[in-house]
Amino acid sequence: MLRVAVPNKGALSESASEILSEAGYRRRSDPKDLTVVDPANNVEFFFLRPKDIAIYVGSGELDLGITGRDLAADADAPVRERLALGFGSSTFRYAAPAGQDWQIADLAGRRIATAYPNLVRKDLADKGIDATVIRLDGAVEISIQLGVADVIADIVGSGRTLGLHNLVAFGESLCDSEAILIERADSDPDPARDQLAARVQGVVFGQQYLMLDYDCPRTVLDKATEVTPGLESPTIAPLADPAWVAVRALVPRRDVNAIMDELAAIGAKAILASDIRFCRF
């Protein structure tokens, strides 16, 4: 039976469970459940702390896991990223009190508070900077005010939380994170793992792409297919009027309105975008 780790709480939990449900797997009925067996798919799900998932997968106790790229990196476990899942995006950056033009070189000799000590130590080592890393499990923003640290390293979203504590982010991101599906780094190929990954990838792809259908004059077909090249090639079918063809192609969801504008501008008609629920590629 395939053994899969899922975040039990936090920002990744609900979206991870939703993707697995869309992929045809059983959901837990009670948020307090720590395990769910899905006999129809021969899978057992374990609901664990997101920070621990890479450790369990890296040890080989579990076959796959969903966690954050930042959490997997900080765990320093022998895992590899199988698939990016397209949710839970964030950046991991240094931040310090506003009012000073902070540079990465200013970290030398400083105390840096973080919930991701391994990630920070690796970054400092890569940069050749000697600093003291202080591990805290949360609310690191307050550590500077309390005199525990000079700088923090933490997940940065909108920056609102930093602003509330009069902090400013500086330097490049240590890690551009999102939810990922991981497996043990030295794991051999396995059909059961491949099947779950393919199902999940199909759901993720369906969230990121739309199917676009439109009628196109033959005279501008080359221009239209440049706008909508699809994955390998668009589908083109004749219409009753020989001067027109029907075109179908996958397009990125984020670009669909701009693409529809371009098609309309060159004379395409009846442009229709449709959601994709499930797919395999």
Curated annotation (Swiss-Prot):
This is ATP phosphoribosyltransferase. HAMAP family: HisG_Long (MF_00079). Its cofactor is Mg(2+). Keywords: Amino-acid biosynthesis, ATP-binding, Cytoplasm, Glycosyltransferase, Histidine biosynthesis, Magnesium, Metal-binding, Nucleotide-binding, Transferase. PANTHER family: ATP PHOSPHORIBOSYLTRANSFERASE, ATP PHOSPHORIBOSYLTRANSFERASE ATP-PRTASE. It holds the Pfam family HisG. Its EC number is 2.4.2.17. It is an enzyme of class 2 (transferase). PROSITE patterns: ATP_P_PHORIBOSYLTR. Its main location: cytoplasm. One of its GO terms (cellular component) is cytoplasm. It comes from Mycolicibacterium gilvum (strain PYR-GCK). It comes from the Bacteria.
